[in-house]
Amino acid sequence: MAKLRVHELARELNMTNKVLLDKLQAMDLPTPVRSHMSSLDDDVVALVKASLVRPKAKSVVEKRIGTTVIRRRKKVVKPAEGGPEETAKPEEGAEEGVQEMDAAQESVSAPEAEKAPEPVAEKAPEPQKAAPAAEEPKAEEGAPAPEKAAPVQAKEEPEEAPQAEAKPAPPKKVDVTPPGDKAKIIAKPEPPQPAEPEPPKEEPAPVELPEEKQAVSAKAADTPAEPQEEPEAKPEIKAEAKAEEGAPEKPAEEPKAKEEQKAAPEDSKEEPKAEEPAQPAEDEKAEEKAKAPEEKEPAKSQEPQAAKEPSKEAPKPKGKKKKKKETAAKIISLPTRPVEPVVPPASRQKPAPQSPAGPGGPGGPGVPPQPRAPQDLGGDPAAKKEKRKKKGRRDGGTTEETDSKFFKKKISFRKKAVVEGADLYDKTPGKLRKGKKGGKAQPVRQQKTQTTTPKAIKRRIKIDEAIAVADLAKRLGIKAAELIKNLMGMGIMATVNQMLDYDTAVLLAAEFGYEVEKANFEEETVLKAEEDAPETLSNRPPVVTIMGHVDHGKTSLLDAIRESNVTGGEAGGITQHIGAYLVDSPRGRIAFLDTPGHEAFTAMRARGAQVTDIVILVVAADDGVMPQTVEAVNHSKAAGVPIIVAVNKMDKEGADPDRVMRELSDHGLVPEDWGGDTIFVQVSAKQRQGLDDLLEMVLLQAEVLELQANPDKLARGHVVEAKVDPGRGPVATVLIQEGTLHAGDVVVCGIHYGKVRAMYNEKRQPLDAAGPACPAEILGLSGVPMAGDEIIAVDDEKVAKQVSSHRAQKQRATELAKSSKLSLDNLFDQMQAGNVKDLNLIIKADVQGSIEALRESLEKLSGDEVKIHVVHAATGTVLESDVALAAVSNAIIVAFNVRPSPKVSDMAAEEHVDIRFYDIIYNAINEIKDAIVGLMESTYKEHVSGRAEVRDTFTIPKVGTIAGCYVTDGKVERHNQVRLLRDGVVIFDGKLSSLRRFKDDVKEVATGYECGMGIENFNDIKIGDVLELYYLEEIKPVLK
C-alpha cells in the first residue's frame, strides 16, 4: 500500500489538518511529522488510527473553591493497551456508573442548600461529563449514561438514536446506579403504579417547599430508590414509564427530540409550581436558570439532598424568595382536571414524547421508563386560577395540553394561506380570525392588491391635441417611467413634463391596451352655424378681390374705381397691406379687397381668395403673364372662385392684349372670344378707360352666382387684417359674410374675444352695424388676432371667454409638443450640424399681415450654413422688452413701418442691440440676405505662381538658413505661400520670411533668375529641394 500523507489521513478521520498534526506531534512516532504534506507508513497509519479512533476515557476532577464556584479539570485516563475497541464499548456503561458514584460522593460534602430547588430535570448530571469517552463530543454522545437530565438528552437525541438502535442492549444496570443519584429526584413519593398509572389527587404543598423537598431527598438518599416508587413529577421517570410499556414505541418517539428539548425545561417545573402557586414573579428567573451553562448544573444535581437539609432552616426559603435559587419551585401550578387514561395514538390526545432509549438511559435496558410530563394530580381552585393567569406566559411552564396549544398557535402564525384574486374582493363573512383570548374577531390581513385589467369601456380615454407625459401616465394608470421607456423605444427622448401630440399619445395608449379619443371642446355646439331658411335670405353685394403681379396697376385700378388716391400713400408705390373697401356704383354696391402683388404676400393673396366671391386678375398689357400672375390664378382655382381678367395699361405703347390672352390660355383661362368662359376686359386705370365695363361684368357675374345672406342673425366673418393702434389698441379689419355685427356685440376671434366698442368704415367713419359683405374696423378685442381668423358673434361673454381660453390652451400645447419633441434623429442632425450658425431676428411690424410676409420670406433664406430663427414677432412699436430679449438672445430687431421711442433707442444703444428700420419689404429681405452672406464662410482656391530649385544653402546667425534658389517656372512674389518638396513629398508648408536678389530686397523674381529665399520658422533646407510658391484666392459665398 502506498504511503499516506497527513492531510489524506485527516480527511479519512474527518478532522482538520491542524488538529491531526497536534495529535501526531503529541504521539511518540518513529518518524517526526512536520506538516500536513508529511508521509506516513502503513504501520504508522495503523498505529495512529488505533490510538485516535479508540476514544480515551476522561474523568473530571472537581474542587469547590467557593460557595458558588466549582472548578472542574479533565483528567485523561489512558485505556489498557491491546484492548480491542469493540470490547471497550460494552464496559463503558459500568465504568460510567462507577465514575458517577465517585463524582457524586465528592460533591456530597459541598454545601449547596440554596441550589436544591433548582430544576434538576433541566440540566445534565455530572456523571455524563465524567464518562470515559468524553474526549470527543461525537464519541461521548454515543456512549450511554445511567441517568441523564431531559434537556441534555433532548440535545443529544438526534445523534444517540441511530447508535442506540444499532448496538445490542447491554444488561440492565439499575442495581449499579448508586442511591445518591436517585436522591436527585425532588418530589413526593407515590404508591407503585403501572406503566401509565392514574395518580391520586394531591393537595398543594405549603410555601416552605424547599425544606420539604430536602427532607424527601434526604429520606430517599438513605434508602435505595425503586423505579416503581418514583414520583411522576420527574420528567425522567415519565420517560422510563413510557419505555417500559413497550420497546417498539421507541423509534416512533425519536423524531420528537427537538420538541422535548423545548418542552422538557417547562415540564420539569410543573410540580413545584403546584406546591407554591403564589409567586408569579419568579417565572422569568426560572427561564434564566433553564438557559444557564451545563457546566454548573451537574454539581447542583449531584449534591445529596440529605446534606442540604441541615443547612436550611424554615425561615430561609421565605427570605430568599426574590433570588434565583428558588425559581424552580414557583414556575407553574399542577392542573386540576383529571388525567384521561392513556389511549392509542389514533385517539384525541397524542402520546407524550419520550427520550430515545439507550443503554443506561431512560427507557433503556436496566432503567425504568420515565414519563415525559407529570400526570395531572389535581389541585385547589386557587391553583386553577393561578394557572389561568399564567397560561399565556412564554417563560412559565405549562401542562402538556397547554404546550400543544402554544405550539399549534406558533405554527398557525407561520402558515401561509393561498388567496385567489377573486377572494381579495370577496367580503363574505367567515374570514375572520379570533384573538388570543377569544375576544372580538380580527380581520385576516389581506394580501397586496393585484393589478386588474379594467373593462373595455374604462380603457377609453379622451385627450386634447396634446397632453403631458405625466398626465397620460395618470390616465393610463401606469408609472411615467414606463411611458418614457416606451418613448425611448420609439426614438423619442421625453421627460415627465414634456407635451406629446395626439398621434404619439394614440400609439402609446395602444401599447397598454387603451383607446384614445379626441376630447375636443364642444365648439361646434356652442358656435353651431344655423342653416338659414330661404325666406330669410336677401341679396348681398359681391366681394371682389383684385389680384395680380406687382406693378401691374391693381391699386391704381381700384383708386380709379373708388376715385381715391391710395397709391400715393404707399411706401415705394407698392401695396404692402391688404385693404377692404365698399364701393357704390350705379348698379349696386361692390366690396373690394386689394391684395399685395409682391411674392412675399402669398398668404395674403390666399386669404383674399378664400373670402372672395369674384377675382379680378389684373395683367399689364405690355408685361404679360408673370410669376405672381400664375400664382393668383392657382389660388383662385383652388378656392373655386370665378376669374375676370382686366388687361391694364392699354394706353401704353407696346400693349399687346393678344399676347396676354395667349399666355393665360396656356394656364386654363380661355377668353370668350376664343370659345372659352373667361371674361377679358381691356382697361386703363390711368386714363380711366373701361372701368364701367369692368364693373358691369362684375355685377353680371354676381347675378349669375346669386349671392344671398341672412342679415337678421348673429354675425360671422373673417379677419382681413389686424394691427395695434397706439391710441386705440388692437384693431381688426373684418369682412362680414353673414348676419349683422352691431356695436356692443360679444365676439370670438381666434384665441381672443371681446366686446365691440366701436366700428369704422374704410374712411374712418363710425358705423353702428355692418351687414353681409361689409368691411369694417372693430375695436375692443383682447389681443391682435391673426389675419384670416374667423370672427363669430355670441350671446354671452362667458361663452366667448370659455371658447377663447380653450383655443389658447390648445394652441399652446401644440406649440410645446412641436418645440419640445426631440427625437434621436433630430439629435443626430443637430450634432452633425454643430457648425451651423444661427441668425436670430425679432420682427416688429405695423400689421399682422406684414409680419406673416416677413417671417415667411426671411425663413426661406435659411441655408445649410446659416439658419434664420425668428425669436419673437408682434405688431406695434419696438418696446423695452423687445430690446431686452434681443440682448439676451443676440438677435437683430427688424422694425417694419414702426419706430421706437427715444428711451427705447437709448436702451438699445446701451445694450448694443442692432435695430433695423424698413418701410419696403424689398429692402428688408435684401439686407437680411447680406447678413446671411456675411455669416457664411468664404472658400479659397489655390493658384501656383512659380517653382524654384535649391542649389545652395547659407546659414546666417540670428536669421537661419537661406536657400539659394533658381526660379525654374513662373515667378516668385514676396507675399506668396511656400511649400517645400523633397523627393515629391511635402516637408513643410509656410510663408516666405525674406526674398532677396544679391543684397537687395525684391518684391518678385521672374523665371531664369537666381534669388535667396528664407522660410519662416524652418531651417531644414537641403540642396536639391524644390520650393513651390502659391497664393490663395478668396471666393465669397453667394446666397442661392
UniProtKB/Swiss-Prot annotation:
Localisation: Cytoplasm
Gene3D superfamilies assigned: 1.10.10.2480, P-loop containing nucleotide triphosphate hydrolases, Translation factors, Translation initiation factor IF- 2, domain 3
PROSITE patterns assigned: G_TR_2, IF2
Source organism superkingdom: Bacteria
Binding site for GTP: 548-555, 594-598, 648-651
Biased composition range(s): Low complexity: 142-153
Keyword Cytoplasm: yes
Region (G4) residue spans: 648-651
GO molecular function, one term: GTP binding
Basic residues compositional bias, start-end: 430-439
GO cellular component: cytosol
Biased composition (Basic and acidic residues): 112-126, 198-214, 231-300, 394-403
Ranges for region Disordered: 73-403, 427-456
InterPro entries reported for this sequence: EF-G-like_DII, EFTu-like_2, IF2_II, IF2_N, P-loop_NTPase, Small_GTP-bd, T_Tr_GTP-bd_dom, TF_IF2_bacterial-like
Chief place where the protein resides: cytoplasm
Compositional bias segments (type: Polar residues): 444-454
UniProt region (G3), positions on chain: 594-597
Function summary: One of the essential components for the initiation of protein synthesis. Protects formylmethionyl-tRNA from spontaneous hydrolysis and promotes its binding to the 30S ribosomal subunits. Also involved in the hydrolysis of GTP during the formation of the 70S ribosomal complex.
Family per record: Belongs to the TRAFAC class translation factor GTPase superfamily. Classic translation factor GTPase family. IF-2 subfamily.
Protein name: Translation initiation factor IF-2
